Design a protein with these regions (language model features):
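Chalcogenol-based redox active-site neighborhoods
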Residues: 1-217
Length: 217
């Protein structure tokens, strides 16, 4: 799986019923994020925080889908612990990928994996802590893979989505540590003549290839 590739479509059981992935995305943006195993500490904090900030994703027209190789029944039982300890229960669908189908399809687990998922330890599933940001065109815009011992920064995922949505609409790029409302960079594909039409107020250019303008609205 690479940035720019079309995401594989699939059908799966989730905590909110059966879905076909591309149909579920529709014309929205989407996040598919996976975790190694239910009833584990780091994942508990992650899923609770994702539930807390779900309104921020909805405001950006982004749907959320979780995934692990546990059953949907396990997900539902674990949700009670998440709500008790984190203050928020998962309020988005979570795939029960007990046959490893989606994890294999997305390259999170080797294609020859088989057996009882309940017998697998979190370490066995260490490669299943991924984040995929997917555009309305069903293409991958961002891939993040985290180690077992490091919880994900979903605030950073929001920041990247802000950048992706801005740069999809305007021919700009966002610089290091950019936040919404800060200056952006005119894309290298835009000639100076075209930039003059787009930005008649001009731009700052410490180097010819570094053309800085206020964020377009």
């Amino acid at each position: 799986m690479k940035i720019g590739e079309t995401t594989p479509d699939f059908e799966a059981e989730t905590t909110q019923g059966r879905i076909r992935f591309h149909d579920w995305i529709g014309n929205s943006w989407a996040i598919l994020f996976s975790h190694p195993k239910d009833f584990t500490p780091v994942c508990t904090t992650e899923l609770g925080y994702m539930a807390k900030i779900k309104p921020e994703f909805e405001r950006r027209n982004v749907k959320i889908m979780g995934l692990s190789i546990d059953s949907t029944g396990d997900h539902e039982g674990w949700a009670k612990d998440i709500e008790e300890t984190q203050g928020h229960a998962p309020n988005y669908p979570i795939i029960g990928d007990a046959d490893f189908k989606v994890a294999k399809l997305y390259g999170m687990l080797p294609a020859d994996i088989a057996g009882d998922p309940k017998k697998r330890t979190p370490a066995d599933n260490a490669t299943v802590r991924n984040v995929y940001v997917i555009g309305p065109d069903k293409k991958i815009k961002l891939i993040l893979v985290y180690p077992m011992t490091t919880g994900r920064n979903f605030d950073e995922v929001l920041r990247v989505i802000d950048s992706l949505q801005l740069t999809a609409k305007h021919q700009v790029a966002t610089p290091v540590n950019w936040k919404p409302g800060e200056d952006v960079i005119i894309a290298g594909s835009v000639s100076d003549d075209e930039a003059k039409r787009r930005y008649p107020q001009g731009w700052k250019a410490p180097k010819p290839y570094l053309r800085i303008v206020p964020q377009p609205q």
